[in-house]
Design a protein with these regions (language model features):
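Carbohydrate-binding surface patches
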Residues: 422-457, 462-464, 468
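Active-site neighborhood of glycoside hydrolase catalytic domains
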Residues: 213-341
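Bacterial Sec-dependent N-terminal signal peptides
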Residues: 1-24
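Aromatic/acidic polysaccharide-binding cleft in carbohydrate-active enzymes
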Residues: 332-404, 421-424
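Solvent-exposed loop/turn segments at secondary-structure junctions
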Residues: 72-77, 111-114, 164-168, 240-245, ...
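Conserved, mostly hydrophobic/aromatic
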Residues: 69, 101, 158, 236, ...
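N-terminal catalytic cores of secreted or lumenal carbohydrate-active enzymes
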Residues: 33-233
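Loop/turn elements at helix/coil->beta-strand transitions in domains of secreted/extracellular proteins
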Residues: 65, 98-105, 153-157, 229-235, ...
Length: 475
């Protein structure tokens, strides 16, 4: 009897050992010439010597809310050059389970710099009760764009922010902060008299009570109007790029004044109208953490604000801000715009930003323009980067390197995933996915391929990382 028990024990042990050692791992690799190459590889029994990178699957860090992209008018305009079938393919590449599978979407409240010109939802001067508020323009452009995305992941979470209030609410009564005549090579032609420029540490909004209350109603009506059109705005940030003064739609806010608007007007208005849309502080594009510190020092700043949104130029503030205010959620709100490089260097910049942001507390990451035409230009003539380029003349669709970077991340790292601790936090990120798998994303910045051994808990695998490659290993 004892002999049979021992024999059975060794048989079971051998079977388990064989199963573990034979476990297949999925590896996906992308270079500038070979995109999304998939292969299967067997786990090693043990790696010789110490592993190059250790992943600690039991060291769970922040929850991941997800990755996303931004809906802009010029993106939808570019998509109209495609046949319905080709347009569906592009949308699927961004939002379906087989594509990037974005979980989040950002949309502007009124005109962004990638709108087809300036507009707001109420340009009737001194309409403090918002009787003339209307989102009619969005019903033809942004709302159809968003609804096409919602056909794929119906639980896509949307958030929004304005680039500018209606011009009549601003001190210079213009949608921008600066005349395009002094912008060097940028030719937005905004027709702003340079004497009306708003530059420096100023608030561009008229801080009188009537304007503040009207603007709070403006936000409330926006959220309600979008809900009536089938789009739930789950979070808003009161201003895009709080501390920048460009020649396109913009409005600067001193932190003390932004706190007054949020704490005394916007938050109470949402309460009055029974709106459960979250209010976040942002988007912060100031690299000095003092902006956030000053905001949170104001009375009642912790009453309504649920999180902090940091734009790429404000990423340097993240380490200090997250350490000092650990109880808030953090989002990277806008990926680096670039200058239409749309090449591997753009991928590297974005990868470095993703690593920095997740290692400093963000739980969500938003790319900027998902689709642009072949010029990649904004209405104000700045050519920027994108995930997908549509050539209006040929109908050709090009997927850029950054598209594949986003796919290497978001395709596997969905809401409910957790960031994991790793021994090399410069070129490696690891997550425990929502379905329990470990997802390791590793970048090889060298020109030459290199072998790299990974230890994930008690599991080992040795992978050849191609030169200049982004890789996802699913264990």
């Amino acid at each position: 009897m004892k002999l049979k028990t021992i024999t059975a024990f060794f048989a079971i042990t051998w079977a388990v050992s064989t199963t573990v050692s034979a476990q297949k791992v999925s590896i996906y690799s992308t270079t500038s010439t070979e995109r999304w190459v998939e292969k299967k590889q067997t786990l090693d029994k043990k790696t010789a010597g110490q592993a190059d990178i250790c992943v600690y699957p039991d060291s769970l860090l922040q929850n991941v809310v997800g990755f996303g992209g931004t809906f802009n008018e010029l993106s939808w305009d570019a998509l109209q050059c495609l046949s319905p079938a080709e347009r569906d393919k592009v949308m699927a590449a961004l939002f379906s389970e087989e594509g990037i599978h974005f979980a989040l979407g950002r949309t502007p409240i009124g005109a962004s710099d990638y709108a087809m010109g300036y507009y707001s939802y109420n340009d009737v001067k001194d309409d403090y009760t918002m009787r003339n508020f209307s989102i009619d323009r969005d019903r033809y452009i942004l709302i159809p764009y968003i609804k096409e995305a919602l056909k794929l992941p119906p639980d896509l979470k949307m958030w929004a922010s304005p680039w500018t209030p209606p011009a009549w609410m601003k001190v210079n009564e213009h949608y921008s902060q600066k005349s395009s005549g002094i912008e060097g090579t940028e030719v937005g032609h905004n027709r702003l008299d340079p004497h009306r420029n708003l530059i420096g540490n100023v608030t561009g909004f008229k801080m009188q009570q009537g304007y503040l209350q009207a603007y709070a109603i403006y936000f409330s009506k926006y959220v309600q109007a979008y809900k009536q059109n089938g789009i739930n705005i789950q979070m808003i940030m009161p201003q895009n790029e709080i501390a920048w003064t460009p020649c396109w739609p913009s409005c600067t806010w001193r932190p003390e004044d932004l706190a007054i608007f949020v704490n005394q007007y916007l938050g109470p208005q949402f309460e009055k109208d029974s709106i459960d849309t979250e209010i976040w502080m942002g988007t912060v594009n100031y690299p000095n953490p003092d902006y956030v510190r000053t905001f949170f020092k104001q009375k009642d700043s912790d009453k309504y604000v649920k999180g902090v949104g940091v734009q790429w130029t404000g990423m340097r503030a993240l380490p200090a801000v997250h350490k000092e205010y650990p109880d808030y959620c953090y989002m990277q709100t806008e990926n680096m715009c670039g200058n239409s490089e749309n090449d591997w260097s753009a991928l590297e910049n974005t990868w470095n930003a993703v690593v920095h942001c997740f290692n400093n507390g963000v739980d969500s990451y938003i790319y900027w323009n998902m689709v642009l035409n072949e010029t990649c230009k904004s209405w104000w003539d700045w050519a920027q980067n994108t995930l997908i380029i549509v050539d209006r003349k040929t109908g050709q669709v090009r997927y850029t390197d950054e598209y594949y970077l986003m796919k290497h991340l978001s395709h596997f790292v969905q809401p409910g995933s957790r960031l994991l601790k790793v021994s090399d936090d410069k070129n490696t990120l690891a997550f425990r996915s929502h379905d329990g798998k470990v997802v390791v994303v590793a970048y090889n910045p060298e020109e030459q391929e290199r072998p790299c051994s990974f230890k994930v808990g008690s599991k080992y695998i040795r992978v050849i990382l191609k030169g200049k490659s982004i890789n996802t290993i699913v264990i």
